[in-house]
UniProtKB/Swiss-Prot annotation:
Gene3D superfamilies per UniProt: Vaccinia Virus protein VP39
Record keywords: Methyltransferase, S-adenosyl-L-methionine, Transferase
Cysteines paired by S-S bonds: none
Listed GO biological process terms: methylation
Pathway of action: Secondary metabolite biosynthesis
Identification of the protein by name: N-methyltransferase tcpN
Inducing stimuli: Expression is positively regulated by the thioclapurine cluster-specific transcription factor tcpZ.
Species this protein is from: Claviceps purpurea (strain 20.1) (Ergot fungus)
GO terms for MF: methyltransferase activity
Enzyme Commission identifier(s): 2.1.1.-
Leading EC class: transferase
Similarity field: Belongs to the methyltransferase superfamily. LaeA methyltransferase family.
Signal sequence, renumbered to the chain: none
Entries under InterPro entries matching the protein: SAM-dependent_MTases_sf
Gene this protein is translated from: tcpN
Amino acid sequence: MESVVDGSSQSRHQSENDRLNIQHALIKSIMGGKLLMAPVNLERPDLRILDSGTAQANWLLDLAALVPTTAQLTGTDIAPEQFPPPSQRPPNMTLQKQSIFDPWNEAMLGSFDVVHQRFVLAACQSDEHGQRAVADLLALTKPGGWIELHEGNMLAIQEGEAHSAMMRFRDIAVAAWVSIGQVPDPGPRLTDWMRDAGVVDMHEEVQTIGLGAAARNQQEAEWSTELCLNMLRTIRRMTAGKGADAPSEQEFDTLEVALREELQEVGNQWYYYLAYGRRRT
């Protein structure tokens, strides 16, 4: 479920964009249509909200319909070419280029009521790296402000003979992430990173996401299947030309067919970690 970004390039291929769109729709459905789990009063006229790793700003655009037009919405991402054009943004939305590993503008420090981020921390190379990235995000909140983070865990899936394609997909994905210094399991590490960063009043939810035939309904079955297939296609591009250790083109072709069939007939599951808390006042 994590962000799949090739460390050699910050641009995104169309299948990766499709994956992010599907991911947003699926997670919104899993959350019962909610965009935030933190107990934030979205009716406040002076709200300042940051969405880090905003991509196409899907989350912010949905949020814009729920908050007053006087609220200030900011989105950041390493790939600004994916931002919606100004004509498709509300006047109270600002989008700008920013990596979570680069220093943040001093004017942004301590200025947000809510900092939100989904599926970005896989890019951290170690627990220390993750804790530091979370601490930098927390520093953007006002004293008493909220931080809400969402991450996945690619390591924990259903295994066994009936899940051979999903297991092979998992193994290829984990190897690809590790090869570019990313961690495949930021979800289980999330609360430790947040606690070490100084987050207080923390709450964590771990949800099981049914994939394909194991999904709660047909729409989520279709979204989750396409999400997995788009991840596989992104990993295929990441590993192209990377030597004998990378799967062959034929293996990717065969695996995509097998993975689709297995998900549609048997299904699988992922664990989804959501945690929120506050900056100490």
